[in-house]
């Protein structure tokens, strides 16, 4: 029997006196979910083999055979013809077994100087790095779609809310830009996370390194890593990079969830600020009039799922002594599902943004309720010389009087306004318009249409 593959089938079974039970095989096998790593596993193995040949650890002939075998395996996997075997536990041993069938002893030499511990850590880093790049691109697509929506409605006025109460008038374009800012930070977090992902564990072997004269920097360069992991124990045992990725993903979904909540509220017939295209909605099996915003509702729900995966990974790592433990097999399903959920959500939201129909009249009507320009009246009095706290009190009395009469501030006559402050003059009526209110906030970060358009231009320049 060889160390690589015993007659009992496992790469390690020569040590044991009895076979592993079928129940344990099913319980411990990961192949039916970690086969997703097949391409990056092959990528890592080819880089490792090239280094072994360069260092004269294996022959050039063995290297050529390994390359030939791996090319065939990749073809079989791509064509869906590769036979994944439960008895072989995981993606690594399934590929190694097939390689050995194809090229003989050369395949058995591939694992020289490495362990599955550093092999899988490398695979996961390659996978996460690729998915980060994908997600950053999808965040760009979503931001561009939101910028288009913001540009179309740079002048469309709706009420801004605090505590779900009407606060001040804003523009819909400004509101969309808030989400553009959030998703921009999400992209930055992903890109920053990538720096810590992009370090090579391969060469750490099981936990202590290897006795072979390997060249880790060569492998790192081949695979596009910025550096190698500088401690072999740390390289194989920690999954903090995956946790960090999932934390950044959870924040993406949190921002998606906040946006979803608003879309659901805005689409409600009681509010009626927007409509969402039929292709993103469903109906009811009993109520024929219903049009349900299922996509934002489901995204809101899936956020809890992604948050749960983050907690699962944190809990997975918290009690493990160094170095590698079988616990870490449980890192993949939460990680994979996080990737799938975030990728699918970002794709559909970028598409859905093009299917949002804004209803400016409904938004404007809502902004005319709730005394949204009260702060503008207070600011007006301050500019006339009244201390802000006194201005605040005077306007509060005016609002109270309007509430009692069921009218808006702009419905008061000049004489009625002057009862609250003699500083009020005829120019107040221009201040109390919705357009005047938003136009007055003409500074960087403000809701004035001019600033909204400038912010859109800045974001477009960054995304170009």
From Swiss-Prot:
EC number: 4.3.2.1
Disulfide bonds: none
Catalysed reaction equations from the record: 2-(N(omega)-L-arginino)succinate = fumarate + L-arginine
InterPro entries, per the entry: Arg_succ_lyase_C, Argininosuccinate_lyase, Fumarase/histidase_N, Fumarate_lyase_CS, Fumarate_lyase_fam, Fumarate_lyase_N, L-Aspartase-like
Any one GO molecular function term: argininosuccinate lyase activity
Record's keyword terms, sorted: Amino-acid biosynthesis, Arginine biosynthesis, Cytoplasm, Lyase
Entry keyword Transport: no
Subcellular location: Cytoplasm
Pfam families assigned: ASL_C2, Lyase_1
Signal sequence region: none
Enzyme class (EC, first level): lyase
Keyword Lyase among UniProt keywords: yes
Gene Ontology BP terms: arginine biosynthetic process via ornithine; L-arginine biosynthetic process
Cellular component terms (Gene Ontology): cytosol
Pathway where this protein functions: Amino-acid biosynthesis; L-arginine biosynthesis; L-arginine from L-ornithine and carbamoyl phosphate: step 3/3
Family as reported in the entry's similarity comment: Belongs to the lyase 1 family. Argininosuccinate lyase subfamily.
The protein's name: Argininosuccinate lyase
Gene transcribed to yield this protein: argH
């Amino acid at each position: 029997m060889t160390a690589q593959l015993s007659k009992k089938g496992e790469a390690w079974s020569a040590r044991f006196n009895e076979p592993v039970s079928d129940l344990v095989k099913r319980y411990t096998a990961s192949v039916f979910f970690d086969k997703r790593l097949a391409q990056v596993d092959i990528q890592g193995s080819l880089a490792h083999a090239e280094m072994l040949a360069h260092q004269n650890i294996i022959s050039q002939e063995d290297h050529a055979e390994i390359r030939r075998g791996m090319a065939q395996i990749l073809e079989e996997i791509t064509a869906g013809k590769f036979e994944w075997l439960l008895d072989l536990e995981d993606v690594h041993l399934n590929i190694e077994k097939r390689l050995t069938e194809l090229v003989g002893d050369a395949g058995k030499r591939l694992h020289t100087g490495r362990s599955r511990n550093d092999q899988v850590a490398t695979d996961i880093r390659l996978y996460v790095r690729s998915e980060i790049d994908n997600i950053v691109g999808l965040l760009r697509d979503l931001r561009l779609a939101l910028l288009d929506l913001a540009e179309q409605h740079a002048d469309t006025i709706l009420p801004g809310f605090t505590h779900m109460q009407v606060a001040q008038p804003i523009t819909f374009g400004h509101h969309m830009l808030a989400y553009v800012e959030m998703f921009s930070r999400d992209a930055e977090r992903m890109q920053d996370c990538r720096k810590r992902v992009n370090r090579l564990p391969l060469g750490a072997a099981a936990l202590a390194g290897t006795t072979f004269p390997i060249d880790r920097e060569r492998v790192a360069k081949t695979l596009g890593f910025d550096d190698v992991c500088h401690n072999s124990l740390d390289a194989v045992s920690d999954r903090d990079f995956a946790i960090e990725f999932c934390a950044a993903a959870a924040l993406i979904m949190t921002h998606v969830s906040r946006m979803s909540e608003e879309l659901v509220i805005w689409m409600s017939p009681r509010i009626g600020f927007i409509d969402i295209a039929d292709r993103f909605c469903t109906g009811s099996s009993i109520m024929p009039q219903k049009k349900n915003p299922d996509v934002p509702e489901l995204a809101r729900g899936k956020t809890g799922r992604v948050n749960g995966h983050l907690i699962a990974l944190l809990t997975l790592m918290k009690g493990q002594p160094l170095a590698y433990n079988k616990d870490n097999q449980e890192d993949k399903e939460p990680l994979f599902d996080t990737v799938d959920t975030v990728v699918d959500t970002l794709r559909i939201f970028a598409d859905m943004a093009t299917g949002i129909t804004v209803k400016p009249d409904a938004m404007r009507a809502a902004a005319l309720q709730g005394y949204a320009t009260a702060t503008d009246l207070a600011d007006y009095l301050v500019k006339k010389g009244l201390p802000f706290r006194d201005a605040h009190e005077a306007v509060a009395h005016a609002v109270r009087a309007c509430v009692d009469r069921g009218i808006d501030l702009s419905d008061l006559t000049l004489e009625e306004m002057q009862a609250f402050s003699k500083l009020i003059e005829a120019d107040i009526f221009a201040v109390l318009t919705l357009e005047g209110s938003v136009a007055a906030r003409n500074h960087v970060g403000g809701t004035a249409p001019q600033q909204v358009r400038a912010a859109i231009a800045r974001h477009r320049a960054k995304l170009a």
